[in-house]
């Protein structure tokens, strides 16, 4: 007899994405701390010598202006790189926030980020 499975909640799917991103960043040599708790400004803090990434993980790749600006402001305050990790069908994509977000639906001010750029010391 097979027991029907419950659909996974949005919380569990989001947490799973955070764990996958954390694992990937660790494989890239970062020390990664997960900030457990819903609605925090930062999901993951990734640290390498001379680098701090503040990472917000979103399956949709979209952040409302209030969350966007909270992440941006906090990163600016301490000199961290604000990063949005987006879930793709296979793998993930990283975006570096480049400015505050003015309004909902506006094109998000970001550029694609590869971790190799950071390792090579490319200006971020």
Enumerate the language-model features and the residues they cover.
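Short acidic/glycine-enriched loop/turn segments that link adjacent beta-strands
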Residues: 38-41, 91
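Alpha-helix C-cap/termination motif
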Residues: 28, 47, 77-78
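Domain-level recognition of nuclease-like catalytic cores that cleave nucleotide substrates
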Residues: 12, 72, 76-124
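Acidic-basic catalytic patches of nuclease active cores, encompassing PD-(D/E)XK
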Residues: 1-35
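Structural signal for conserved beta-strand scaffold positions within catalytic alpha/beta enzyme cores
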Residues: 34, 56, 84-86
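Conserved catalytic cores of phosphodiester-cleaving nucleases, focusing on short active-site segments
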Residues: 25, 44-61
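Short, surface-exposed beta-edge/turn micro-motifs
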Residues: 41-42, 51-52, 80-83
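Active-site-adjacent loop/helix micro-motif of nuclease/hydrolase catalytic cores
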Residues: 60-71
